[in-house]
Amino acid sequence: MSKQYRFETLQLHAGQTVDPTGARAVPIYQTTSFVFKDAEEAAGRFALTNPGGIYSRLGNPTTDVLDARVAQLEGGAGGIAVASGSAAITYSILNVANAGDNIVAASTLYGGTYNLFTATLPRFGIETKFVNPDNLEEFEAAIDENTKAVYIESIGNPGINLIDVQAVADIAHKHNIILIVDNTFASPYLFRPLEHGADVVVHSATKYLGGHGTTLAGVVVESGKFDYKGSGKYPGFSEGDEHYNGLVYGDLPIPFTVKIRAQLLRDTGACITPLASWQILQGVETLSLRVERHVENARKVVDFLTKHPKVAWVSYPELEDSKYKALADKYFPKGVGAVFTFGVKGGKEAGIKLVDSLEIFSNLANVADAKSLVIHPASTTHAQLNEEQQKSAGVTPDMIRLSIGLENIDDIIEDLAQALDKA
């Protein structure tokens, strides 16, 4: 799109050129592979000198629209959709780190990411150094000559902590390494990390982007601004790829996502299906509308809980007594999302009783659904962490995580009220 359209227009139109059939909706190209008009074109496709379809593991016209749309919504130069958020996170690390390298990460991460960093990546020879994200000096101190990336979440899961993204980006860039930000809990409608120094953004598109709890997907978006070749830190971008006639990824306009596609997606195959891409696109078209209502409902629920006599604490960065209030004001003028945590007086047992007493809320391991959701993180999403690791991640035994949906707000609050009465 030649004109610089606004967010609400981009979420409906970005990335799509009407195909020869004239279909207004994005078509589902349900095919595994694509016909070459001749041998020369086939050779060019495989050499990456002729853009176009080869095999849907590497790309598909339906997915191409999703790639471009999310990239534009994030203000990025390029994007690539994959099979899940976990795949997006994994690829973002493996794209820059090899055996003997390390990354520096905030300790307050989603349990699945924490497990990836502590259980799986070490098998590849990649170490993770966890730091307290409230102390910027720890990021600086943890970086060494083998550090390839700093990794944070724009809104921590499940503690809903905020980080000074620009300050962390400045630290990373001082050492000529990239900052990767998981922006799942914010969505590009509430926050765009690339505008505050991040180099790569990852999403579990299953959450707000898709929005309806139907489809697994992940997306990686790059700024296109980081000089991988000139940084001296990334030989995979500065040295030629012998499998593609010496192609140097660092010479490309969007090196990060091209390298994922040409190497990691080619070899490990965590590809998104055309149908899944189409389903996520349906959610993206209403992203701003849904997130506005999510935030509106969440604020009212937070107000209700903070005044309830059975509630011990509420963690939501917009609250005046939150230590993240200043960061919420700085980075999240439209709101800090609709996922937050709280504790019930009576501790873990009372909290679990509340979870079991809710009727509208579904007890399940997802967030950012149109429907309201609840979970007890210590016994589920972060159960594989020991007590010390849970504490470092901001998970307490009494913590309950809510994801506020789009139901009538009175029904949501009444459901919480009756469950609190039973807790």
Each language-model region and where it sits:
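Conserved PLP-enzyme active-site core in the AAT-like
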Residues: 2, 11-17, 80-307
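N-terminal "arm"/small-domain region of PLP-dependent enzymes with the aminotransferase-like
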Residues: 2-60, 68-69
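Conserved N-terminal alpha-helix of the aminotransferase class I/II PLP-enzyme fold
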Residues: 38-87, 112-120
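Short amphipathic alpha-helical segments
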Residues: 51, 77, 216, 276, ...
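PLP-dependent enzyme catalytic core of the Aspartate aminotransferase-like
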Residues: 118, 145, 290, 356-357, ...
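Short hydrophobic/aromatic beta-strand micro-patches
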Residues: 221, 341-343, 403-405
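Conserved small-domain helix->loop->beta segment predominantly found in fold-type I
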Residues: 268-271, 277, 282, 286, ...
